[in-house]
Amino acid sequence: MGAQWKVKHKEAAANAKGRTFGKLSKEIMIAARAGADPDMNSRLRLVVEQAKKASMPRETLERAIKKGAGLLGESVNFERLTYEGFAPHRVPVIVECLTDNINRTVSEIRVLFRKGQLGAAGSVSWDFLYQGMIEAVPAAADADPELAAIEAGAQDFESAEEGATLFLTESTDMDAVCKALPEFGFTVQSAQLGYRPKSTVDGLTEEQMAEVEAFLEAIDNHDDVQNVYVGLAG
Protein backbone atom coordinates (compact mmCIF):
# COMPACT_ATOMS: atom_id res chain seq x y z
CA MET A 1 0.00 0.00 0.00
CA GLY A 2 2.76 2.47 0.99
CA ALA A 3 2.28 6.16 0.10
CA GLN A 4 -1.12 7.79 -0.30
CA TRP A 5 -3.97 5.75 1.16
CA LYS A 6 -7.09 5.27 -0.96
CA VAL A 7 -10.48 3.81 -0.10
CA LYS A 8 -10.55 0.19 -1.25
CA HIS A 9 -14.18 -0.85 -1.01
CA LYS A 10 -16.27 -0.05 -4.09
CA GLU A 11 -19.24 1.40 -2.19
CA ALA A 12 -17.01 3.54 0.02
CA ALA A 13 -15.00 4.66 -3.00
CA ALA A 14 -18.19 5.74 -4.77
CA ASN A 15 -19.28 7.75 -1.74
CA ALA A 16 -15.82 9.33 -1.61
CA LYS A 17 -16.23 10.99 -5.03
CA GLY A 18 -17.92 14.05 -3.56
CA ARG A 19 -15.27 14.33 -0.84
CA THR A 20 -12.57 14.17 -3.51
CA PHE A 21 -14.12 17.13 -5.32
CA GLY A 22 -14.33 19.02 -2.03
CA LYS A 23 -10.66 18.42 -1.30
CA LEU A 24 -9.60 19.42 -4.79
CA SER A 25 -11.73 22.57 -4.61
CA LYS A 26 -9.83 23.65 -1.49
CA GLU A 27 -6.46 23.07 -3.20
CA ILE A 28 -7.63 24.97 -6.28
CA MET A 29 -8.84 27.93 -4.22
CA ILE A 30 -5.54 28.17 -2.36
CA ALA A 31 -3.48 27.88 -5.54
CA ALA A 32 -5.64 30.47 -7.31
CA ARG A 33 -4.68 33.10 -4.73
CA ALA A 34 -1.54 33.58 -6.85
CA GLY A 35 -3.56 34.10 -10.03
CA ALA A 36 -6.48 32.59 -11.92
CA ASP A 37 -4.57 31.70 -15.11
CA PRO A 38 -3.14 28.14 -14.97
CA ASP A 39 -0.66 29.03 -17.74
CA MET A 40 0.87 31.67 -15.48
CA ASN A 41 0.43 29.80 -12.19
CA SER A 42 2.24 26.46 -12.14
CA ARG A 43 0.79 25.37 -8.82
CA LEU A 44 -2.74 26.00 -10.05
CA ARG A 45 -2.03 24.21 -13.31
CA LEU A 46 -0.97 21.04 -11.49
CA VAL A 47 -4.05 21.01 -9.25
CA VAL A 48 -6.31 21.63 -12.24
CA GLU A 49 -4.74 18.58 -13.93
CA GLN A 50 -5.60 16.51 -10.85
CA ALA A 51 -9.16 17.81 -10.90
CA LYS A 52 -9.62 16.96 -14.56
CA LYS A 53 -8.29 13.46 -13.99
CA ALA A 54 -10.83 13.05 -11.18
CA SER A 55 -13.59 14.17 -13.60
CA MET A 56 -14.50 17.23 -11.57
CA PRO A 57 -17.37 19.09 -13.30
CA ARG A 58 -16.14 22.11 -15.25
CA GLU A 59 -18.53 24.47 -13.45
CA THR A 60 -17.20 23.34 -10.06
CA LEU A 61 -13.61 23.74 -11.22
CA GLU A 62 -14.11 27.22 -12.64
CA ARG A 63 -16.01 28.42 -9.57
CA ALA A 64 -13.19 27.24 -7.28
CA ILE A 65 -10.64 29.14 -9.38
CA LYS A 66 -12.69 32.34 -9.34
CA LYS A 67 -13.39 32.09 -5.62
CA GLY A 68 -9.72 31.53 -4.78
CA ALA A 69 -8.63 34.41 -7.00
CA GLY A 70 -11.11 36.73 -5.28
CA LEU A 71 -13.24 37.23 -8.38
CA LEU A 72 -16.49 36.37 -6.57
CA GLY A 73 -16.04 38.79 -3.69
CA GLU A 74 -15.54 35.96 -1.17
CA SER A 75 -12.47 35.52 1.00
CA VAL A 76 -10.70 32.17 1.25
CA ASN A 77 -9.00 31.48 4.58
CA PHE A 78 -7.58 27.98 4.89
CA GLU A 79 -4.62 26.94 7.04
CA ARG A 80 -2.46 23.89 6.35
CA LEU A 81 -1.91 21.46 9.21
CA THR A 82 0.14 18.26 9.24
CA TYR A 83 -0.23 15.50 11.83
CA GLU A 84 2.05 12.53 12.41
CA GLY A 85 1.48 9.38 14.37
CA PHE A 86 0.55 5.74 14.20
CA ALA A 87 -2.47 3.75 13.16
CA PRO A 88 -3.18 0.56 15.14
CA HIS A 89 -0.27 -1.93 15.18
CA ARG A 90 2.35 0.84 14.90
CA VAL A 91 1.67 1.64 11.24
CA PRO A 92 3.15 5.12 10.57
CA VAL A 93 0.75 7.77 9.23
CA ILE A 94 1.04 11.37 8.03
CA VAL A 95 -2.19 13.35 7.72
CA GLU A 96 -2.44 16.64 5.81
CA CYS A 97 -5.35 18.99 6.52
CA LEU A 98 -6.76 22.25 5.21
CA THR A 99 -9.00 24.02 7.68
CA ASP A 100 -10.79 27.29 8.30
CA ASN A 101 -10.95 26.52 12.03
CA ILE A 102 -7.71 25.25 13.55
CA ASN A 103 -9.10 24.63 17.05
CA ARG A 104 -11.94 22.48 15.68
CA THR A 105 -9.62 20.42 13.51
CA VAL A 106 -7.02 19.87 16.23
CA SER A 107 -9.69 18.66 18.64
CA GLU A 108 -11.38 16.33 16.16
CA ILE A 109 -8.15 14.82 14.82
CA ARG A 110 -7.04 14.06 18.39
CA VAL A 111 -10.27 12.13 18.92
CA LEU A 112 -9.77 10.14 15.71
CA PHE A 113 -6.22 9.23 16.75
CA ARG A 114 -7.40 7.64 20.01
CA LYS A 115 -7.46 4.27 18.25
CA GLY A 116 -3.88 4.86 17.23
CA GLN A 117 -1.27 7.24 18.61
CA LEU A 118 -0.83 10.92 17.74
CA GLY A 119 2.85 11.84 17.66
CA ALA A 120 4.92 15.01 17.75
CA ALA A 121 6.33 16.70 14.65
CA GLY A 122 9.08 14.49 13.24
CA SER A 123 7.91 11.35 15.03
CA VAL A 124 7.32 9.47 11.76
CA SER A 125 8.19 11.91 8.94
CA TRP A 126 11.86 10.91 9.24
CA ASP A 127 10.82 7.58 7.69
CA PHE A 128 9.13 9.21 4.67
CA LEU A 129 10.45 11.03 1.61
CA TYR A 130 8.75 14.27 0.54
CA GLN A 131 8.62 14.01 -3.25
CA GLY A 132 6.92 15.10 -6.41
CA MET A 133 4.69 12.35 -7.82
CA ILE A 134 3.74 12.70 -11.48
CA GLU A 135 1.37 10.26 -13.15
CA ALA A 136 1.70 10.22 -16.93
CA VAL A 137 0.60 8.03 -19.83
CA PRO A 138 2.52 7.29 -23.04
CA ALA A 139 1.42 9.45 -25.95
CA ALA A 140 3.17 7.10 -28.38
CA ALA A 141 3.65 3.33 -28.46
CA ASP A 142 7.44 3.67 -28.36
CA ALA A 143 7.57 6.03 -25.36
CA ASP A 144 10.29 4.79 -23.00
CA PRO A 145 9.65 5.61 -19.32
CA GLU A 146 13.27 5.02 -18.30
CA LEU A 147 14.59 7.37 -20.98
CA ALA A 148 11.90 9.92 -20.16
CA ALA A 149 12.76 9.80 -16.45
CA ILE A 150 16.45 10.36 -17.13
CA GLU A 151 16.02 13.11 -19.71
CA ALA A 152 13.24 14.96 -17.88
CA GLY A 153 15.15 14.94 -14.58
CA ALA A 154 13.04 12.55 -12.50
CA GLN A 155 14.66 10.61 -9.67
CA ASP A 156 12.90 7.34 -10.43
CA PHE A 157 9.79 5.84 -12.00
CA GLU A 158 7.46 2.89 -11.46
CA SER A 159 4.41 1.37 -13.09
CA ALA A 160 1.03 2.80 -12.10
CA GLU A 161 -2.56 1.78 -12.82
CA GLU A 162 -4.07 1.46 -16.30
CA GLY A 163 -0.78 1.60 -18.17
CA ALA A 164 0.38 4.85 -16.59
CA THR A 165 3.84 5.56 -15.20
CA LEU A 166 4.55 7.26 -11.88
CA PHE A 167 7.58 9.56 -12.13
CA LEU A 168 9.18 10.51 -8.80
CA THR A 169 11.04 13.80 -8.43
CA GLU A 170 12.70 16.08 -5.93
CA SER A 171 9.99 18.32 -4.47
CA THR A 172 11.60 21.37 -6.10
CA ASP A 173 11.84 19.72 -9.54
CA MET A 174 8.26 18.55 -10.02
CA ASP A 175 7.04 21.43 -12.19
CA ALA A 176 10.12 21.31 -14.44
CA VAL A 177 9.75 17.55 -14.93
CA CYS A 178 6.04 17.99 -15.73
CA LYS A 179 6.93 20.46 -18.46
CA ALA A 180 9.67 18.22 -19.87
CA LEU A 181 7.83 14.87 -20.01
CA PRO A 182 5.75 15.66 -23.15
CA GLU A 183 9.01 16.09 -25.09
CA PHE A 184 9.74 12.43 -24.38
CA GLY A 185 6.36 10.99 -25.28
CA PHE A 186 4.37 11.23 -22.04
CA THR A 187 1.16 13.12 -21.25
CA VAL A 188 0.88 14.26 -17.63
CA GLN A 189 -2.41 13.29 -15.98
CA SER A 190 -1.75 14.46 -12.45
CA ALA A 191 1.05 15.80 -10.30
CA GLN A 192 1.32 16.46 -6.59
CA LEU A 193 3.78 16.75 -3.74
CA GLY A 194 3.45 14.10 -1.08
CA TYR A 195 5.08 11.60 1.24
CA ARG A 196 6.36 8.14 0.36
CA PRO A 197 7.53 5.71 3.06
CA LYS A 198 11.15 4.58 3.14
CA SER A 199 10.00 1.33 4.77
CA THR A 200 6.63 -0.31 5.32
CA VAL A 201 4.95 -2.44 7.97
CA ASP A 202 4.00 -5.90 6.76
CA GLY A 203 2.99 -9.26 8.21
CA LEU A 204 -0.32 -8.04 9.64
CA THR A 205 -3.11 -10.57 10.02
CA GLU A 206 -6.40 -10.08 8.18
CA GLU A 207 -8.01 -8.87 11.40
CA GLN A 208 -5.18 -6.43 12.11
CA MET A 209 -5.31 -5.09 8.54
CA ALA A 210 -9.05 -4.51 8.92
CA GLU A 211 -8.40 -2.47 12.09
CA VAL A 212 -5.79 -0.35 10.29
CA GLU A 213 -8.05 0.25 7.29
CA ALA A 214 -10.99 1.21 9.52
CA PHE A 215 -8.76 3.75 11.27
CA LEU A 216 -7.48 5.18 7.98
CA GLU A 217 -10.97 5.40 6.52
CA ALA A 218 -12.22 7.31 9.58
CA ILE A 219 -9.34 9.77 9.24
CA ASP A 220 -9.87 10.18 5.49
CA ASN A 221 -13.60 10.80 5.98
CA HIS A 222 -12.94 13.93 8.03
CA ASP A 223 -13.92 17.02 6.05
CA ASP A 224 -10.65 18.85 6.79
CA VAL A 225 -8.35 15.98 5.80
CA GLN A 226 -6.76 16.37 2.37
CA ASN A 227 -4.30 13.47 2.20
CA VAL A 228 -3.41 10.42 4.28
CA TYR A 229 0.01 8.83 3.77
CA VAL A 230 0.79 5.47 5.30
CA GLY A 231 3.77 3.15 5.62
CA LEU A 232 1.87 -0.08 5.04
CA ALA A 233 2.82 -2.95 2.74
CA GLY A 234 0.26 -4.60 0.51
Swiss-Prot record:
Keywords: Cytoplasm, DNA-binding, Transcription, Transcription regulation. The keyword Iron-sulfur does not apply. It is found in: Cytoplasm. GO terms for biological process: regulation of DNA-templated transcription. GO terms for molecular function: DNA binding. Pfam families: TACO1_YebC_N (PF20772), Transcrip_reg (PF01709). It comes from Pseudomonas savastanoi pv. phaseolicola (strain 1448A / Race 6) (Pseudomonas syringae pv. phaseolicola (strain 1448A / Race 6)). This is Probable transcriptional regulatory protein PSPPH_2212. The lineage of its organism: Bacteria, Pseudomonadati, Pseudomonadota, Gammaproteobacteria, Pseudomonadales. HAMAP family: Transcrip_reg_TACO1. The keyword Cytoplasm applies. GO terms for cellular component: cytoplasm.
